[in-house]
Amino acid sequence: MPSVPLYFLTFLFGKNTPDHLLVKLYMLFGLLAIYRMMRDAGYDKASAAGLSLLCSFGSCLLALTLDGAVWYQAQLLAYMLTCLALLLMLRDHPTPALFLYALAVGCRPFNVLYGLLLYALYIDMARRDGQAWSTLLHRLILGTLLGLFVAAAYALYNYARFGNPLEFGHNYLPEFSTQGGTQFALWHIPANFKTFVLGLPFSEGMDGWTLNQFGFSFLLASPIFILLLVQCAADLCARRFTLLKGGLMLCFILHLLLLLMHRTFGGYQFGARYTCDMIPYAVLYLCLPGRRRSLRVWEWCLLAAAIGFCVYGTVSMAL
């Protein structure tokens, strides 16, 4: 999918496409989509802006914007498309939402899990509004067909290029084509869990304390997930944990487990960049009913600390 906008840009820039600008624009449009979701959900302007900044400048997503490499383009484009899909679905536009979602899956295959969430979200909204099942299903048909068309196009392209409809080039990366090893396996989970769930950002070496450059806990790298878990716990305690919220958290956990099965989990990086794919789960959860629509003092403090740490980490990795 990232090659599509690049293809059209070649007519203007030739081989010198603005790769570094693209990754920044993808993050910016994702930020704006999150802001609109928060405002639509009833957050005040300051809190909506704060949460949007926490998802971008206060997460390991920030480090990805310094490099226009195609894998970073793919991840940020998927992030933007997924955020836009959620925004459109929340605004009762299922057809473009499902179309953008299908495009996002072409960038990050595990984003396919958001499809379950999009359908569940729309059904929940439609049924609460008293919409008949026949009307509901009718409104989902076109978007579903468009999504299937996009999936078929991806499959044909992959087959023509790699001889396999499910291969999108990942097995041709140097760490797999030359070093070998199993790309996805259950036995990768324990080591990845120790690093990317429990790992600390700093370690002590010969030169003192240094930033870990091959990953650390995704909760510290992107504290928006801390807000997600705190809100989830609050909903459980207050008995506000609905079926939709349960489905969202189930998709979140499954997505994380699938990522933890990856052998390299992103390699050299600030934080846990693969988990940036899961930020839209946190955004949607915080938009659902049951949460206060303004940030508390401790959440503002978390936001400030997160942005400061991520700016520091991003600069450190770039030097």
Region spans (language model):
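Membrane-proximal envelope and lipid/glycan-remodeling enzymes
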Residues: 1-319
